[in-house]
Amino acid sequence: MINVNCLNNIAACGLKLFSDEYNTESSFEDAQAVLVRSAKMHDMELSDNLLAIARAGAGVNNIPLDKCAEEGIVVFNTPGANANAVKEQVIAAMLLASRDLIGGNKWVADNAEDPDIAKATEKAKKAFAGQEIKGKKLGVIGLGAIGQLVANAAIALGMEVYGYDPYVSVKAAWNLSSEVKYISDVKDIYKECNYITVHVPALDSTKGCLLYTSPSPRDTERSR
């Protein structure tokens, strides 16, 4: 029997994929394998039994990689597993940044009992008009599994998309819309774009890749 510990909630449909030789209800101390999502493992004591850690997601910054390397513990990640969900969050964030949907919803709730709600709405609605994202410029930093989906979705919404990724793979490039404009200097993203979305791993090599300008574009950061 191989003992597996789940540090975070893992969907039942995923756990059903294990065969009968796996015990997915093991304690952390007895586990030979660990499944983790967002739990921070850097201060956790790793047992001598532990052979592997699998992250349900792309980033591994919550796992002590150096310690695992020293102790021979193999670390896996699952890039792209939640890519579509993150893409939808990014698109939603851009819409929220462009049109004050939350503020508008609060205004309706606060004024729902106003007997002159029709007149009040006509007077107040301009404050929540916002702007369309069609025709606006989106900069995508990181063109991996998530970044390419965001770029393609933004193209479909009529945006002008600029992409930056010095390590873009051939597969990712093939999956990108031909309308995405490739940028070789990340600074040009900040010069050109109304919106910027960042999808890069948290590594020493990516520290300092974000620039803050004034006036700043609308940023949405969905990195690990």
Regions found by a protein language model. Give the residues of each.
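An N-terminal-biased, well-structured beta-alpha scaffold segment characteristic
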Residues: M1-T78, K191, V198, L211
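Short gly/ser/thr-rich secondary-structure transition/capping motifs
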Residues: L17-Y22, V34-R37, P115-A124, N175-I183, ...
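Rossmann-like adenosine-cofactor binding region
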Residues: A39-E45, P166-S214, R218
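Phosphate-binding beta-alpha-beta segment of Rossmann-like dinucleotide-binding domains, i.e.
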Residues: P79-K137
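Glycine-rich Rossmann-fold phosphate-binding loop(s) that bind the pyrophosphate
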Residues: L143
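Hydrophobic/small residue at the entry helix of a nucleotide-binding pocket
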Residues: I146
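Aromatic pocket-lining residues of Rossmann-like dinucleotide-binding sites
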Residues: A154
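Conserved beta-strand positions in the Rossmann-like core of class I SAM-dependent methyltransferases
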Residues: Y162
